[in-house]
């Protein structure tokens, strides 16, 4: 299976149904002036408002402990949701890479 790219704005959710583990890499994530929540495999992380996260030069590194690379087992779900509205998530670019490449 080839890699999959999720890009857009608003709440985002991905359920791994590949039959194998996947690596989820957040290249870009921008949150507006309200909090958002990232959830995966029983973990919940608050995503600070007004910040940009991701694997790029000058990405925010010290504002909060938001992971930008996550491993998901088959059947597990990853999501980012705005605290007050889906518009809290201004933009994202996420790549999902299957374990087998």
Predicted regions and their residues:
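Exposed low-complexity, polar/acidic, P/S/T/G-rich flexible segments that act as propeptides
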Residues: 85-101
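Surface-exposed loop/edge segments in extracytoplasmic proteins
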Residues: 2, 46-57
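Extracellular/periplasmic carbohydrate-active domains that bind, remodel
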Residues: 54, 58, 91-94
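Beta-rich globular "head" domains
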Residues: 1-44, 93-98
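Beta-sandwich interaction modules
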Residues: 57-75
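A short local loop/turn or secondary-structure capping micro-motif enriched for an aromatic residue
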Residues: 32-34, 61-65, 87-88
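Noncatalytic modules at the cell exterior or secretory-pathway interfaces
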Residues: 71-85
């Amino acid at each position: 299976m080839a890699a999959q790219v999720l890009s857009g704005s608003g709440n985002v959710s991905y359920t791994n149904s590949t039959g194998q583990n996947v690596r989820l890499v957040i290249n870009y994530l921008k949150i507006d002036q309200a909090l958002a929540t990232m959830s995966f495999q029983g973990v919940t992380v608050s995503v600070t408002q007004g910040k940009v996260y991701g694997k790029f030069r000058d990405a925010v590194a010290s504002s909060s402990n938001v992971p930008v690379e996550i491993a998901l087992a088959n059947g597990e779900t990853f999501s980012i949701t705005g605290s007050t509205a889906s518009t809290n998530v201004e933009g994202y670019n996420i790549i999902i890479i299957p374990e087998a490449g």
